[in-house]
A protein has these predicted regions:
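Membrane-interface alpha helices of multi-pass inner-membrane proteins
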Residues: 26, 33-53, 57, 218
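Membrane-interface anchor segments at the N-terminal boundary of transmembrane helices
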Residues: 149-207
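Specific aromatic-rich, kink-prone transmembrane helix
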Residues: 15-39, 241-244
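Transmembrane-helix signature of polytopic, lipid-linked glycan biosynthesis machinery
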Residues: 214-229
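Membrane-interface helix-loop-helix junctions at transmembrane boundaries of multi-pass membrane enzymes
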Residues: 67-82, 189-212, 260-261
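Short acidic/glycine- and proline-prone juxtamembrane loop motifs at membrane-interface regions
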Residues: 2-13
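Transmembrane helical bundles and short interhelical boundary loops of multi-pass, membrane-embedded
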Residues: 58-65, 74-84, 88-92, 97-111, ...
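Hydrophobic transmembrane alpha-helices of multi-pass, membrane-embedded glycosylation machinery
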Residues: 41, 53-64, 236-239
Length: 304
């Protein structure tokens, strides 16, 4: 649901999600030059891609220092800083080409030196985003994001033409509830198995990706408790929530249950999630429905 809503609205978060996923995939495939380009493009969409860059650099350096003797650390370390330091910065600056070539860009004329204007622009953006504390009726603490405690209403009207005296039309930036509620449990399970693998010193690539995605996409927001933030930011780590669900489904399929039973349970779960998505589709797409039908979809009072 959340991805669908983003795909129909003019926000940068979906483009950010695409390039971040591409970067993480390429990084996982050891295609580091391409990953550096992809994460640079992601940073060109929104600065929050930096958290994924930091996570990938941290893991890459950990692997280098744990696998190479001290005499062989210099070359691979320098290479990683070029791939995930110099290259993303160059790509990010290149993404500003239109601004540099135009005389009408925001703050472009702040200084006769275009680079000074660019730095000033960044200073203003940083000040705005770190100092944004104005109250908003749909702001939501990151603690509530996983369970869709306070989804963001992008649009609401009470039009006519639904066959009833009272009609409603809303675009609610909310994930499919049952998917996210189950995903919350799945993420907790995945983290538990990841910690067990860490203690046993075994490598679990799937779990590593899930934890990296959740740590980089979700965890940083908890450090902005006074800032005005919204649930729809969660789209960046939704793919990793789904990966956690897939991981748990695989655990079930590989369990001691008879294959027919485990497959039936997984199929039933997927079916329920699909039906839940269809049920909420009208408020994902802004369909005109009766007020009573809209109210039936407000399972929590905090969704109103």
């Amino acid at each position: 649901g959340l991805v669908l809503v983003h795909s129909r609205t003019a926000l940068l978060d979906l483009f950010l999600t695409f390039f971040v996923l591409l970067a993480v995939y390429l990084w996982h495939q050891q295609r580091h030059w391409l990953a550096g380009i992809a994460i640079g493009l992601a940073m060109g969409c929104k600065w929050s891609a930096v958290y994924f860059l930091v996570a990938m650099v941290f893991v890459s350096l950990y692997r280098i220092f744990s696998k190479h003797p001290s005499k062989e650390l210099v070359r691979p370390t320098i290479m990683k800083f070029i791939q995930y330091g110099f290259l993303p910065v160059i790509v990010y600056i290149t993404s500003w080409t239109g601004w540099f070539l135009s005389n009408r860009g925001w703050d472009r004329q702040w200084s006769s030196n275009s680079f000074s204007s660019w730095i000033h622009y960044h200073s203003e953006m940083l000040g705005f985003h770190t100092g944004l504390t104005e109250k908003h009726s749909y702001q939501a603490n990151p603690w509530s994001w996983m369970v869709m405690g306070r989804p963001t209403s992008f649009f609401y009207e009470s039009p006519k033409g639904c066959g009833s005296d009272n009609c409603a039309q809303e675009v609610l930036a909310m994930g499919t509830p049952l998917l996210w509620w189950a995903g919350t449990i799945a993420v907790a399970v995945a983290i538990g198995f990841w910690l067990r693998a860490l203690v046993k010193r075994t490598n679990e690539p799937a779990l590593n990706l899930i934890v990296l995605g959740m740590a980089a996409g979700y965890l940083p927001w908890f450090f902005f408790q006074s800032r005005t933030v919204f649930t729809f930011y969660a789209v960046i780590f939704e793919p990793f929530v789904i990966l956690a669900l897939v991981y748990c489904a695989k655990l079930l399929l590989d369990s001691s249950l008879k294959s027919g039973i485990s497959q039936a349970l997984v199929a039933a779960f997927v079916t329920v999630i699909f039906l839940n998505f269809v049920f909420f589709l009208p408020i994902f797409t802004g369909e005109v429905i009766t007020y009573d039908a809209w109210l039936q979809r407000m399972w929590l009072s905090s969704w109103i």
